[in-house]
């Protein structure tokens, strides 16, 4: 959660911004809530319909299933052709990194919140950054202030983490936890240490 606060700050999300979040896993869901708290309009893209439904419950204004519609076209449609002021790439693939850059508006920012696995590279035309004046950032850590802020946002109910925890599994059933995650069943799986 604290690292998401750091990512939102690095992306300069402001009131009235159109924010695209690519990926609606646990981290994407936290970014949805933080962007809404900052006054942004939130668009989230993910191929898993059940996750998109949860994202709507947590405040996402619009959802995009990239298996059913073109993400870039839909973002442009939703933003009157501008693109997203801020993009958070919360999925670690080179494809989503390229998508984030393409979806950003002029003077937009793109935050690579997930490292790629396996490690990969993207071909990048510097003219895209130059002429669109895009700021590219990455985030993975947090400050002590971010940690304190995360606790306060959860304490005051501004960020709802219970919606994100989909399974609580005992240590004895830890193999079931891995299976649940591998099959994309639910969101955050917590292993309870009894």
Q: What is the predicted role of each segment?
A:
Residues 1-69:
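Mid-domain Rossmann-like dinucleotide-binding core that forms the NAD(H)/NADP(H) cofactor-binding site
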Residues 1-4, 72, 84, 97, ...:
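A general structural signal for well-ordered alpha-helical segments in protein cores
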Residues 44, 112, 136-138:
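Hydrophobic residues in well-ordered beta-strands that form the structural core
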Residues 11-13, 53, 58-133, 175:
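Glycine-rich cofactor phosphate-binding loops and adjacent beta1-alpha1 units
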Residues 98-102, 144-194:
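C-terminal hydrophobic helical "lid"/dimerization subdomain
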Residues 4, 19-21, 35, 42-44, ...:
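Hydrophobic packing within well-folded, soluble alpha/beta domains
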Residues 48, 116, 142:
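Residues in the short beta-alpha loop(s) of Rossmann-like NAD(P)-binding domains
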